[in-house]
Amino acid sequence: MSASPPISAGDYLSAPEPDALKPAGPTPSQSRFQVDLVTESAGDGETTVGFDSSPPEYVAEPPPDGLRDSVSGGEEAKGRFRVVNFAASSPDAAPAETAQNGDTVMSEGSLHSSTGGQQHHHYDTHTNTYYLRTFGHNTIDAVPKIDFYRQTAAPLGEKLIRPTLSELHDELDKEPFEDGFANGEELTPAEESAAKDVSESKGVVKFGWIKGVLVRCMLNIWGVMLFIRMTWIVGQAGIAYSCIIVIMATVVTTITGCSTSAIATNGFVRGGGAYYLISRSLGPEFGGSIGLIFAFANAVAVAMYVVGFAETVVELLMDSGLLMIDQTNDIRVIGTITVILLLGISVAGMEWEAKAQIFLLVILITAIFNYFIGSFIAVDSKKKFGFFSYDAGILAENFGPDFRGQTFFSVFSIFFPAATGILAGANISGDLADPQMAIPKGTLLAILITGLVYVGVAISAGACIVRDATGIESNFTLISNCTDAACKYGYDFSSCRPTVEGEVSSCKFGLHNDFQVMSVVSGFSPLISAGIFSATLSSALASLVSAPKVFQALCKDNIYPGIAIFGKGYGKNNEPLRGYFLTFGIALAFILIAELNVIAPIISNFFLASYALINFSVFHASLANSPGWRPSFKYYNMWASLAGAILCCVVMFIINWWAALLTNVIVLSLYIYVSYKKPDVNWGSSTQALTYHQALTHSLQLCGVADHIKTFRPQCLVMTGAPNSRPAILHLVHAFTKNVGLMLCGHVRISSRRPNFKELNSDMLRYQRWLLNNNSKAFYTCVVAEDLRQGTQYMLQAAGLGRLRPNTLVIGFKNDWRTGDIKEVETYINLIHDAFDFQYGVVILRLREGLDISHIQGQDDSSGMKDVVVSVDISKDSDGDSSKPSSKATSVQNSPAVQKDEDDDGKAHTQPLLKKDKKSPTVPLNVADQRLLDASQQFQQKQGKGTVDVWWLFDDGGLTLLIPYLIANKKKWKDCKIRVFIGGKINRIDHDRRAMATLLSKFRIDFSDITVLGDINTKPKSEGLTEFAEMIEPYKLREDDMEQEAAEKLKSEEPWRITDNELELYKAKGNRQIRLNELLKEHSSTANLIVMSMPLARKGAVSSALYMAWLDTLSKDLPPILLVRGNHQSVLTFYS
């Protein structure tokens, strides 16, 4: 017996103590979870765990019989784990009744620890057997389990969900509860369902790598090309070039096979073959386009192979004089009968189809062996056909090329389609027992075997058959002046060689002239015909199965409308019966046409396009460097995959250039359609990964780029609150930042309590999704703070990333400053001061009607920040034309404020962003609210012919001029002219106008007019002075009416108050704001937008109330006006 090491403090365990010394622990009903006694091993001869008052020991002898019976009554199963026996060092140390009492997990309210060698028994609330459980099965915290990582319901049942972070981390409920499902002590309903599904799914047919992949790939690669074209290729290209052609094709397919293997081993592969591999790697755009043409190509390939079979049968009938009608119609009849029989095999189930494939493979291999055996048997009767068995002279003669009307690449284009069957196994990935193992092993081995056979046939045919033969017996006399290899056998075939290039040989036999040479060489020629039948039928059968499987996966993803009906599966194997009949219909249509010479190259190019994208998928995923790209197949290389993709594209044009162009046009058209439709899927494709990678890389690169005037972009932090609560400011800022600069929608949630971060995260995702769905190129960010100023300071300091940081603060004008809490005015003005302190520019937007529409449905946040309930539909692009006037809605329900949102399931439906009570009645909008709602949408509409008036009174670096220039360049504003207003002296108006015109020309900014205002400092009208005085009256300190000490105290408590000294000191500046308002009304009352230099107030010298009064006086009763003040860093330059 060997003792285990002492228990460390980190184990949080202590040995049991006598019951009298133990504090009262929780009863089973009081503890939070009820967990049973569990261990992983039991039985005689096994290592079991002993316990007593000393540190635990491991014992090898079996437990006493009494304890065995008392603990569990023998070994029994409970849930997913066994309840087994436990042994003690002595029966006295662990009484039977102690083990029988059951165990209770320590409650969350109690503590249990030990430090050093001392044991703190006071906190130990566990019974003895607590320490004997298998680790991880005595808490709600789950141990690693594969079921937690399934994305959807697994074949073994429903998806299991691990305990959430909230369940483990959040505060306990007041009432403790018992959880019998914690870590699997009992079967959950999902697991019970899984167990039931396992018992019901035993009849499902799943193939291994040989029957599922190797056999199918070999049958598809060994097509009729092996029997009727390989020898002709040797005659044209010679042995050397033929081997090079086979090796080149094999290199392309091997690279593609490695790429396929890499994708297939980068996670669980479902049904769908090439479509599934490409779509889950490159995304739905490429996957959807390839999936459709790949399924169609397989369907038409069925017709190609069946017609090839029918032509061979008709030739045999013609030789025997047994034609039924004529050659063409006989092909149609035989082809129709054949495809019906193949459909019956496919519909019968994958198991029958697999058996048929095995039978056909046996015939095919027998035919190949029949050829090689026959090549060693020299028969005199075959010499007249050019077959002399193996001869060094024939090998030397046939080693080089002898192209007759062909070139190397034309011959290569004829052979390459024979090598395009490598996805036959991957296409039924859903029917494989272990796709991750089967696809790499079966595909690559099939490429190797078939490649060796093709090379063997090329060498064999070139070494024993001459290129031309007459088929006429020789008289075996010595032939003079004969240099051919057949001469020494007494045959002179020199007359067969064409004397003029392009002339057809007069002989009908030999490598050049006879497509049935392999029948001549073979030991038993009918076996070659059987091999041809086997090759064509097996390929047709594989394509007939592949097309519905791929199409079924495409239908289930719902990328194209109207095809979901074909995604339904039947039976235990989820067979796509509707897909089978659709494939049968397509194949039958092309069989009846019986002219496949035009469609054949297109089909080959469809397959090659799929291979190219599979290779590109691996390169793309490797380039993205995503942590999720971890294929277990290591024998791939991203650059080899890129080379494979390029080679596939090159081969497409070699085979047929117009077919390659047509294929690319079809793929591009389908790609554009799927991109436009934007299917609601998220597969974690490499496109997404590369987008992140590029964004990260470029963001880091930007950090090393110094600021320059020419690269300045307005990057705006827009204090919108909830994004659609102030749509007007969102739309206007979007007009000059879209595709130009950054827009960050800032939202400060005011709360003095602990924030609900779960709700905060949910809202962040929801609001960002709303921006995306409404084509607003902006980001949403939210912070929780005790007041608005603190939250805004957080954003001013931390918003953005690297160089993608805001440089301009955009806020709405505070229309209710005179009726609201004056402390909010203090906060508002301090926001402006804070922005300037952080070197931000500041932009303030004011509309007569106001900006905030969130109150229209009565949803005001209790925290003080108004959250959105109404959302304005901006589904059209902000630059698109929208000249139609807004509808005059009479209620919230009928207003365009209702938006289209999406739930987690991706289904769109109409609802407000924040749901309101369904039982609440529809409230008609009053006139003011209707005007507010209409005003909030005015920047969505086409502005028509109007003006954007720029009052550039103070040089702030050019931001006041840049913003209207960017706005006027947008499609909705393109008919608006820019008018510039500047201040100047009456006696030099022309000079100032010419100087400004020169500056604007150097800035390359178009303008329609420049107005120099020489009367800005004229005294304003008395009405304006009176209104201003009445405006500021409630906010005066009136220090003359009180003691100096009391006045100073009041000023310190209420710093927003206006002192008489301050008012007198800034009297001229206040009068200027009144006068400017008069001039604005005079010159710009009909403008579509006014952009004006914002007056500054010195911090600490001008009170908040006085500054607010200036801004109000300057901008009241006007069209939409932007008050702009840059940070006085140049943003415009006339240098190149």
Curated annotation (Swiss-Prot):
Positions of transmembrane segments: 209-234, 239-261, 286-314, 328-351, 352-376, 408-427, 439-462, 524-551, 577-595, 596-619, 637-656, 657-672
Catalytic reaction(s) noted: K(+)(out) + 2 chloride(out) + Na(+)(out) = K(+)(in) + 2 chloride(in) + Na(+)(in)
Regulation of activity: Activated following phosphorylation by OXSR1/OSR1 and STK39/SPAK. Inhibited by bumetanide.
Main location: membrane
Keywords: Cell membrane, Chloride, Disulfide bond, Glycoprotein, Ion transport, Membrane, Metal-binding, Phosphoprotein, Potassium, Potassium transport, Sodium, Sodium transport, Symport, Transmembrane, Transmembrane helix, Transport
Pfam families for the chain: AA_permease (PF00324), AA_permease_N (PF08403), SLC12 (PF03522)
Scissor helix: annotated span: 689-702
Protein name, as recorded: Solute carrier family 12 member 2
Organism: Danio rerio
Gene field: slc12a2
